[in-house]
Amino acid sequence: MSVVDFSKLYPDNRQEGETVLRQAQLVMLRMLKIIDYICRKHDISYWMCSGTLLGAVRHKGFIPWDDDLDICMIREDYERFVEIAVNEFPEDMMLQTRETDPHYHYLPLPCKVRDKKSFILSPGYEDEECEKGLFIDIFPMDRYHKQKLPFMFEKMVKVYNTFICKSLDAIYFKDESIRSEEHTS
């Protein structure tokens, strides 16, 4: 288990949410901060995608009705993350793969990070015996051109810096920063 006391670094503030949806979003935001901490510690790159990215850009947080978070990693970083995260997560979180949860059958998505203190039913999976806490989906990216990837990333960073925020040190979800000032590499 983790040697970092995430309960102090990123306290569980789910009860501060005024609605069930907001409580779920606060849980996922805490989970994302912990994922970010682990990724930074181990030099693992990731990026937000889908509605998560749209919410961060358009709403400076979650899309108001959004109930999930999605991130991507290139395959090499994804494989390292899966290997490392199992031992880094606090007790109230888990890495859900077919190896860590034999009842997990959400294919083709090979990995989720789950909150173990919550419960969510996904349509069509009510009878499954797998863990069912709130989750963050992690999508491994397999097809990319190695020589074009740095160029594409550089373009994304320029767009990000120009239109979204002044620095890649933090992404703000309302008043919550994903990149913690408390974190030291």
Spans of features found by a protein language model:
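Intrinsically disordered, low-complexity acidic/polar segments
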Residues: 80, 147-148
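Active-site nucleotide-donor binding segment shared across nucleotidyl transfer reactions
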Residues: 36-69, 78-79
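Conserved catalytic core of two-metal-ion nucleotidyltransferases
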Residues: 6, 12-40, 85-146, 162-180, ...
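Short hydrophobic/aromatic beta-strand micro-patches
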Residues: 72-74
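Conserved oxyanion/phosphate-binding beta-strand-loop segments in alpha/beta enzyme cores
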Residues: 1-4
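A short secondary-structure junction signal
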Residues: 148-154
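Generic detector of well-ordered alpha-helical segments enriched in charged/polar residues
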Residues: 154-157, 161
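Tryptophan-centered motif/residue detector
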Residues: 10, 47, 65, 139-140
